[in-house]
């Protein structure tokens, strides 16, 4: 079974409260998604490997740490996932960025893939899939399946708000993929929206419906 982590840092929870508010403007919503993603990336990257290296400081010779191991790819699920990319890349500037285009049929709630572009060496990279919402889990499962089909082996899923139904669905389909969220909400309503949630993240990010 994969690990599911809710990141309860006070700054994240405070910003998430503003994000949920229906009166928050498009600009503020966009800024907050970016800020929360950057803060979450600290926890998501906690297990990155380090190695010892020798350097000279202005004062003395020293043994210090630097990152080693796998390179990173950040893969947003379009379109709402785009809002989280800059925050992660600010923290991990060497990361490559892929894209997976998914849309959800509003009647069946089933996801459909319409675009995918990934780094050529995706099989060697640690992939962080980003999407603000984990609702039914359909889009996340399909995105992960598309990544695995193209060789990705090391995948994490980072979302802002998750529903229990979506977490269970992803864990059942992909027990090797760890999930990180800023909040675990109560349930999905009859329209497939997370309750209490934050509405349609894509619409609120881009100011379009």
From Swiss-Prot:
<comment type="similarity">
    <text>Belongs to the UPRTase family.</text>
</comment>
<feature type="binding site">
    <location>
        <position position="194"/>
    </location>
    <ligand>
        <name>uracil</name>
    </ligand>
</feature>
<comment type="pathway">
    <text>Pyrimidine metabolism; UMP biosynthesis via salvage pathway; UMP from uracil: step 1/1.</text>
</comment>
<dbReference type="GO" id="GO:0044206">
    <property type="term" value="P:UMP salvage"/>
</dbReference>
<keyword id="KW-0342">GTP-binding</keyword>
<dbReference type="Pfam" id="PF14681">
    <property type="entry name" value="UPRTase"/>
</dbReference>
<dbReference type="GO" id="GO:0004845">
    <property type="term" value="F:uracil phosphoribosyltransferase activity"/>
</dbReference>
<dbReference type="InterPro" id="IPR000836">
    <property type="entry name" value="PRibTrfase_dom"/>
</dbReference>
<keyword id="KW-0808">Transferase</keyword>
<dbReference type="InterPro" id="IPR005765">
    <property type="entry name" value="Ura_phspho_trans"/>
</dbReference>
<comment type="function">
    <text>Catalyzes the conversion of uracil and 5-phospho-alpha-D-ribose 1-diphosphate (PRPP) to UMP and diphosphate.</text>
</comment>
<dbReference type="InterPro" id="IPR029057">
    <property type="entry name" value="PRTase-like"/>
</dbReference>
<dbReference type="GO" id="GO:0000287">
    <property type="term" value="F:magnesium ion binding"/>
</dbReference>
<dbReference type="GO" id="GO:0005525">
    <property type="term" value="F:GTP binding"/>
</dbReference>
<feature type="binding site">
    <location>
        <position position="79"/>
    </location>
    <ligand>
        <name>5-phospho-alpha-D-ribose 1-diphosphate</name>
    </ligand>
</feature>
<feature type="binding site">
    <location>
        <position position="200"/>
    </location>
    <ligand>
        <name>5-phospho-alpha-D-ribose 1-diphosphate</name>
    </ligand>
</feature>
<dbReference type="InterPro" id="IPR034332">
    <property type="entry name" value="Upp_B"/>
</dbReference>
<feature type="binding site">
    <location>
        <position position="104"/>
    </location>
    <ligand>
        <name>5-phospho-alpha-D-ribose 1-diphosphate</name>
    </ligand>
</feature>
<keyword id="KW-0021">Allosteric enzyme</keyword>
<keyword id="KW-0328">Glycosyltransferase</keyword>
<protein>
    <recommendedName>
        <fullName>Uracil phosphoribosyltransferase</fullName>
        <ecNumber>2.4.2.9</ecNumber>
    </recommendedName>
</protein>
<dbReference type="InterPro" id="IPR050054">
    <property type="entry name" value="UPRTase/APRTase"/>
</dbReference>
<keyword id="KW-0547">Nucleotide-binding</keyword>
<dbReference type="GO" id="GO:0006223">
    <property type="term" value="P:uracil salvage"/>
</dbReference>
<keyword id="KW-0460">Magnesium</keyword>
<feature type="binding site">
    <location>
        <begin position="131"/>
        <end position="139"/>
    </location>
    <ligand>
        <name>5-phospho-alpha-D-ribose 1-diphosphate</name>
    </ligand>
</feature>
<feature type="binding site">
    <location>
        <begin position="199"/>
        <end position="201"/>
    </location>
    <ligand>
        <name>uracil</name>
    </ligand>
</feature>
């Amino acid at each position: 079974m994969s690990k599911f982590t809710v990141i309860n840092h006070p700054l994240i929870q405070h910003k998430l409260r503003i994000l949920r508010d229906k009166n928050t403007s498009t600009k503020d919503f966009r800024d907050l998604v970016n800020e929360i993603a950057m803060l979450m990336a600290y926890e998501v990257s906690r297990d990155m490997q380090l190695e010892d290296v020798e350097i000279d400081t202005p004062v003395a010779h020293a043994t210090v740490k630097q990152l080693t191991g796998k390179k990173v790819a950040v893969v947003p699920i379009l379109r709402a996932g785009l809002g989280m990319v800059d925050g992660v890349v600010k923290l991990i500037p060497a990361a490559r960025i892929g894209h997976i285009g998914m849309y959800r049929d509003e009647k069946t709630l089933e996801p459909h893939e319409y675009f995918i572009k990934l780094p050529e060496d995706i099989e060697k990279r640690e992939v962080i899939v980003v999407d603000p919402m984990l609702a039914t889990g359909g889009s996340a499962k399909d995105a992960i399946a598309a990544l695995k089909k193209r060789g990705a082996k090391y995948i994490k899923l980072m979302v802002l708000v998750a529903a229990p139904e979506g977490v269970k669905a992803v864990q059942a389909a992909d027990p090797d993929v760890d999930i990180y969220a800023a909040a675990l909400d109560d349930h999905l309503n009859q329209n497939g929206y997370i309750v209490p949630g934050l509405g349609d993240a894509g619409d609120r990010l881009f100011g379009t419906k």
